[in-house]
Amino acid sequence: DEILSNWDDLKRKEKKQETDTSTLESVSKSLPSLIRAQKLQKKAAKVGFDWPDVSGALDKVEEELAEVRAAMGGDGDVEEEIGDLIFAVTNVSRFVKVDSERAAEKTCNKFVRRFADMEQQAKAQGRQLSELTLEEMDALWDEAKKKEHRE
């Protein structure tokens, strides 16, 4: 009987511990940050902590961008504000049903393709990117972008 009683006490304590934890703690910290952010936002939305529509989420992006600018001017923690901005943009992606991790990966791949194209264009001119001005590199970037849109 004592063993059974101890077992029941342990189970009650476990159950209390489970109910004392936050709804959001069930989202794994080992997930890539953008996936984790979307899951956290989705869980928060399930209990009603959400904007009624995407316009509220977009306004939050603008607010967070202003906070990044202020932090860069010495009025705050830049890293924290950039994190808040990324989190807010991720929330917009959740609203419009875009996987933020996949969107970021696609953008990284696009950047690599366009940069490689810039390098090839510079090489065709007998130059290295490091020898070009920012304006010249911007022109190569625009050309790489146009090529992608034509393909």
Regions of interest found by a model, annotated:
Residues 1-82, 86-151:
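Flexible "arm" and connector segments at domain edges
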